[in-house]
Amino acid sequence: MATYKVRLFNAAEGLDETIEVPDDEYILDAAEEAGLDLPFSCRSGSCSSCNGILKKGTVDQSDQNFLDDDQIAAGNVLTCVAYPTSNCEIETHREDAIA
């Protein structure tokens, strides 16, 4: 099992934290365990409440069923069902990015 450093940030929310996330744990779950308050609703990858923008790195979000290929290519990531597959940086609180 690998563990990756995941930077979660949003200037408007005053958030800039780096947490360690095992490759078998969802990013949202690890953030909550670290005491961070990130937005979410369904926790099943079926809505956009937890959407973030992947700025660096890679994730596996194959459990989600909401984002289309274009939205994923644009960097959208549903943190409730995303596993890190490398060190990464995610701009959180970005439900507004889904068009």
UniProtKB/Swiss-Prot annotation:
<comment type="similarity">
    <text>Belongs to the 2Fe2S plant-type ferredoxin family.</text>
</comment>
<keyword id="KW-0479">Metal-binding</keyword>
<dbReference type="GO" id="GO:0009055">
    <property type="term" value="F:electron transfer activity"/>
</dbReference>
<dbReference type="InterPro" id="IPR010241">
    <property type="entry name" value="Fd_pln"/>
</dbReference>
<comment type="function">
    <text>Ferredoxins are iron-sulfur proteins that transfer electrons in a wide variety of metabolic reactions.</text>
</comment>
<feature type="binding site">
    <location>
        <position position="42"/>
    </location>
    <ligand>
        <name>[2Fe-2S] cluster</name>
    </ligand>
</feature>
<feature type="binding site">
    <location>
        <position position="47"/>
    </location>
    <ligand>
        <name>[2Fe-2S] cluster</name>
    </ligand>
</feature>
<dbReference type="GO" id="GO:0046872">
    <property type="term" value="F:metal ion binding"/>
</dbReference>
<keyword id="KW-0408">Iron</keyword>
<keyword id="KW-0411">Iron-sulfur</keyword>
<dbReference type="InterPro" id="IPR006058">
    <property type="entry name" value="2Fe2S_fd_BS"/>
</dbReference>
<dbReference type="GO" id="GO:0022900">
    <property type="term" value="P:electron transport chain"/>
</dbReference>
<feature type="domain" description="2Fe-2S ferredoxin-type">
    <location>
        <begin position="4"/>
        <end position="96"/>
    </location>
</feature>
<dbReference type="InterPro" id="IPR001041">
    <property type="entry name" value="2Fe-2S_ferredoxin-type"/>
</dbReference>
<dbReference type="InterPro" id="IPR012675">
    <property type="entry name" value="Beta-grasp_dom_sf"/>
</dbReference>
<feature type="binding site">
    <location>
        <position position="50"/>
    </location>
    <ligand>
        <name>[2Fe-2S] cluster</name>
    </ligand>
</feature>
<feature type="binding site">
    <location>
        <position position="80"/>
    </location>
    <ligand>
        <name>[2Fe-2S] cluster</name>
    </ligand>
</feature>
<protein>
    <recommendedName>
        <fullName>Ferredoxin-2</fullName>
    </recommendedName>
</protein>
<dbReference type="GO" id="GO:0051537">
    <property type="term" value="F:2 iron, 2 sulfur cluster binding"/>
</dbReference>
<keyword id="KW-0001">2Fe-2S</keyword>
<keyword id="KW-0249">Electron transport</keyword>
<dbReference type="InterPro" id="IPR036010">
    <property type="entry name" value="2Fe-2S_ferredoxin-like_sf"/>
</dbReference>
<keyword id="KW-0813">Transport</keyword>
<dbReference type="Pfam" id="PF00111">
    <property type="entry name" value="Fer2"/>
</dbReference>
